Design a protein with these regions (language model features):
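A structural signal for long alpha-helical coiled-coils and helix-turn connectors
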Residues: 43-46, 74, 105-108, 135-139, ...
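Membrane-proximal N-terminal soluble sensing/regulatory segments of transmembrane proteins
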Residues: 44-119, 143-149
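Polar/charged, Q/E/K-enriched amphipathic alpha-helical segments with strong coiled-coil propensity
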Residues: 80, 109-162
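A structural signal for well-ordered alpha-helices, especially hydrophobic packing surfaces
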Residues: 39, 63, 67-70, 94, ...
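Individual transmembrane alpha-helices with interfacial aromatic-anchor signatures
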Residues: 51-55, 149-158, 187-196
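Hydrophobic membrane-targeting segments
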Residues: 1-50, 190-228
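Extracytoplasmic
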Residues: 147-185
């Protein structure tokens, strides 16, 4: 009887140890997955949101520089730059903008972002045509006509591009907020796994103590039986 009871107790302990091992492995796997998801979220927040937001700022900065150069050339009566020199500077800014756009396109883009980016590329192309048209008419139009040409087309083109850049900036904010919420959910999930692990350890510990206590009771009864 004592041998049978001992086998039964060892079986229970073995099952409990197996449960401990299984639960520990499961929780560990879930925690590893959470950590990977968190790393992915933070990486996306930096590479796909923070860096593009910075690039959008640089594009806006270069766009403003282009507008300032062309506007100064059109409205100033004493230009320090020739039409060719201005054209070279505008092309240099265009090249920088194209480089930033190519870099931006390699990041992860949401659908709304893709639409705004396509719209931006079209407007930038239209803007290049307008700038070229103004420069081509420098020697054929007087200052008043040249200013009218700028006011009627180029100025609005710059404003449209700025508005599109603003929309892209808003996308970074919205998607960045979503990534932040996702990261917070992952953190809460990780805390839950840790709490479950602690509760399981407490429950299994209590069961082991109860088994050992029951074993001591049986041993005392057997000792009394032997004394009798």
């Amino acid at each position: 009887m004592k041998f049978a009871y001992s086998i039964k107790q060892k079986t229970k302990i073995a099952i409990l140890l197996f449960l401990i091992m299984a639960c520990t492995i499961l929780i560990r796997l879930l925690e590893d997955r959470s950590i990977k998801n968190m790393e992915k979220a933070f990486s996306s927040l930096y590479n796909d949101r923070l860096v593009p937001a910075t690039d959008i700022f640089y594009i806006s900065e270069k766009l403003y520089a282009k507008r300032f150069l062309l506007e100064t050339f059109v409205y100033s009566d004493q230009n320090k730059l020739s039409a060719q020199q201005l054209n070279d500077k505008l092309k240099a800014y265009d090249k920088n903008i194209d480089t930033l756009l190519a870099k931006y396109e390699k990041t992860f883009l949401v659908n709304n972002e893709k639409n705004h980016l396509t719209e931006l590329k079209v407007k930038l192309l239209e803007n290049k045509v307008l700038e070229k048209n103004i420069l081509l008419n420098v020697n054929t139009l007087d200052k008043a006509a040249l200013r009218k040409l700028y006011d009627s087309n180029a100025e609005q083109s710059y404003l449209d591009i700025s508005n599109t850049l603003s929309q892209l900036t808003k996308v970074q904010t919205v998607v960045g907020e979503q990534l932040k919420e996702e990261s917070q959910k992952i953190v809460r999930g990780t805390n839950l796994y840790s709490t479950l692990q602690l509760l399981i350890a407490i429950v299994i510990g209590a069961l082991i103590v109860s088994i050992l206590a029951a074993s001591n009771v049986v041993n005392i009864r057997n000792d009394k039986f032997n004394l009798n």
